[in-house]
Regions:
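Short aromatic-rich membrane-water interface segments that cap or initiate transmembrane helices
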Residues: 43-57, 138-145, 169-172
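Alpha-helical transmembrane segments of multi-pass membrane proteins
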Residues: 18-35
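Non-transmembrane, juxtamembrane loop and terminal tail segments
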Residues: 250-260
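Alpha-helical transmembrane segments of multi-pass integral membrane proteins
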Residues: 16-23, 85-97, 111-123, 141-159, ...
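Membrane-interface transmembrane-helix boundary segments in multi-pass integral membrane proteins
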Residues: 5, 49-54, 171-189, 213-240, ...
Length: 260
């Protein structure tokens, strides 16, 4: 494949913001001032905050996005789907990291809201306008944004809960338990959209299951703990639906699984 220099300003910008996003996440996870707060091992937690190991999904997302910023030089599909929205998403994501680390949690949530909007624009444009014609399209265009979209949605909800229903030293109130279970149920229910919309998105759905198992591991309150496990199992099982349909011969174009 020949290198495609069309839209090079956007492609160069994608590389720069990718490096910024990667550096910010690495710094928040492994470096920095111990007095600063990290979204991945945060002082600001709620009763739907998952275990810290779940945040290592960023490693896979960053690896795939790194492939995307290389792949963009060999096909115009990346620019057609992503445009300048990856730049916007990365800048708002970096702003979120900085604001959260400095304790500006509400402003951090606003920044994350705009980052989620930019990622969602890319995600739905890919679903509506572009079919994955090659394995490289799947791995370095569809898959990274499937994972990114599901994960940033989870982060948005968990950050909101950390602001409005934080952990209490005396344990959760009854309202907080019910509120947490409702939040988990809402997140789990979005698996229907991931599996049923367009061609189906197994990768995005599995991110939700991964998150719910992380909550199961982290939260000790019985109702929240076991609800997270039950919902995680249910979500993981629901992701098998497209494969079951294929196995029994009921597969249609609307339910064909697409990893990304």
């Amino acid at each position: 494949m020949a290198i495609d220099f069309r839209h090079w300003p956007s492609k160069v910008a994608n590389i720069l913001v990718y490096v910024t996003l990667l550096s910010g996440n690495l710094y928040s996870t492994f470096g920095g001032d111990q007095d600063q707060d990290s979204p991945y091992d945060s002082k600001h937690q709620s009763y739907i905050t998952p275990a810290s190991f779940t945040f290592y999904i960023w490693t896979l997302i960053h690896f795939l996005l790194g492939g995307m910023v290389v792949y963009q030089w060999f096909t115009d599909k990346v620019y057609e789907a992503v445009g300048w929205h990856f730049v916007m998403a990365s800048l708002f994501n970096a702003l979120w990291l900085g604001l959260w680390s400095s304790g500006q949690t509400f402003l951090a949530f606003i920044a994350l809201f705009f980052a989620t909007g930019a990622v969602s624009f890319i995600y739905y444009r890919l679903k509506d306008q572009d079919n994955a014609e090659t394995l490289l399209d799947v791995i370095f265009l569809h898959l990274p944004f499937s994972l990114y979209h599901a994960w940033i949605f989870v982060l948005l909800i968990t950050n909101l809960f950390a602001i409005i229903s934080p952990i209490r030293s005396g344990g959760p109130s009854t309202f907080q338990v019910v509120f947490a279970i409702a939040g988990l149920a809402f997140i789990a229910s979005t698996v229907i959209g991931y599996i049923e919309y367009k061609q189906g998105d197994v990768a995005g759905a599995l991110v939700l299951a991964w998150y719910l198992f992380g909550v199961f591991d982290q939260q000790e309150q019985d109702a929240i703990h076991w609800t997270a496990l039950g919902l995680g199992i249910a979500v993981a099982a629901y992701t098998l639906k497209p494969f079951v349909f294929r196995l029994v011969g009921r597969q249609t174009g609307e339910t064909a699984p697409l990893l990304g």
